[in-house]
Amino acid sequence: MNNQKTALILDAGFASLPLQQAVKTAGFRTLVCSGKAHDAGMLTADITCEQNYADSEAVLKIAQQHKVAALLPGVTDVSYLSGCRVAHSLGLPGFDAPDVSDTIFLKDKFRAWALSKGLPVPQAAWTDEQARQLKLPLLVKPVDAYSGNGISKVTDWAMLDAAIETARNASPGKQYVVENFCEGALYSHSAFIRNGEIVCEFFVDEYCTVYPWQVNSSSLSQNLSPDMRDSVSECMQSIVSDLRLVDGLLHTQFIASEDQFWLIELTRRCPGDLYSRLIELSTGVNYAGWFVAPFLGKSSPAVPRRPVQTRNIARHTVSVNRAMRFTRFAFKSLPADLIEVIPLTRPGTLVQPAPGDRAGLIFAEFRDDAALRQMTPHLKDYFLLNTYEGHSDA
């Protein structure tokens, strides 16, 4: 009789594969739930269930049927929000309570909570009338969408109504938030929490060079000052303490100028597009293993608070600004070695414009940190698509 425990993973996308492997390495049988039967994770799981995991009642029945010992989110917000409700019902570890999760994940709730606490976030509004009290330019966002879907920049009041309609249409709940547009560079902060304290953290430079609201190039931060890192870290620790977050990952995108920063989005799921692999290649830290540990009832190992960057790694998501028929990748010369290329489509497939689609992921190792800093913002000019129509930039 097989006494191996079963872990249910709510995601089958390619970026969840490192999580699935980490769960297997920890000794669990993997049961993957997804509404997309052909996703990569459905091919590698021990057991599969074709079900839209946004339906938490259906997920609860699956978990009970298979008597799962652990439940994990993947790289989507929905996987965490659905999972936290099921875990709350079953008493499984790793998730915050549903009300805390909603505060973190839903943009309108987080903005309102953060403003009430005096945290550094853009000024926000939730109605047309309130929005007109803010100063231009503005960003209008759906409160519950992802990957930059439905976001518009408003530079003239005549644009506001259309931007609100775009956000509503992209929102499953038909809700939006309007906020001041903050000038600065985009970064992420990925922190692991243990016993209410941030014990390990990473800072990453992020660039949106194809679609303005979706990251496609990144590396461990070469630009953020030590003082700014400390300020962001202290701010995130205050959130951890205030919300009494459980052990695990807290991942944040923020914008910073030379002397101030603004929190943009927080999440407790694993960031997508193989962010875990970027950290692992750059520092040697088993990011995916650390992420899954609390959901399996385990602790992550003790390490330095800010692990040293040991390799000059850049990550690039190959995407396009107009529909293209994919045939193959092409690469221009760089002072770097291509160390991993992950195709996400097949020859002949029509790749849709970002943020709705991408053709592949590429990891490159630069020869020194100066080259990494200089070249990462420009990777879209070096990693290209070849199409039936001819040679085209990606």
Where are these regions (language model features)?
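Short beta-strand-to-loop capping motifs
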Residues: 155-156, 191, 318-322, 362-368
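Active-site nucleotide/adenylate-binding loops and adjacent lid/helix of ATP-dependent enzymes
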Residues: 101-177, 183, 194-197, 222-238, ...
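A structural supersecondary motif
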Residues: 250, 335-348
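Phosphate-binding core of ATP-grasp and ATP-grasp-like enzymes
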Residues: 167-175, 180-222, 230-251, 255-263, ...
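Gly/Ser/Thr-rich active-site loops/lids in small-molecule metabolic enzymes
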Residues: 279-293
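ATP-binding N-terminal substructure of ATP-dependent carboxylate-amine bond-forming enzymes
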Residues: 1-100, 297-301, 311, 320, ...
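Short, well-ordered beta-strand elements within core beta-sheets of diverse protein domains
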Residues: 152, 180, 280, 360-367
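A glycine-rich beta-turn/hairpin centered on an aromatic-Pro dipeptide
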Residues: 296-337
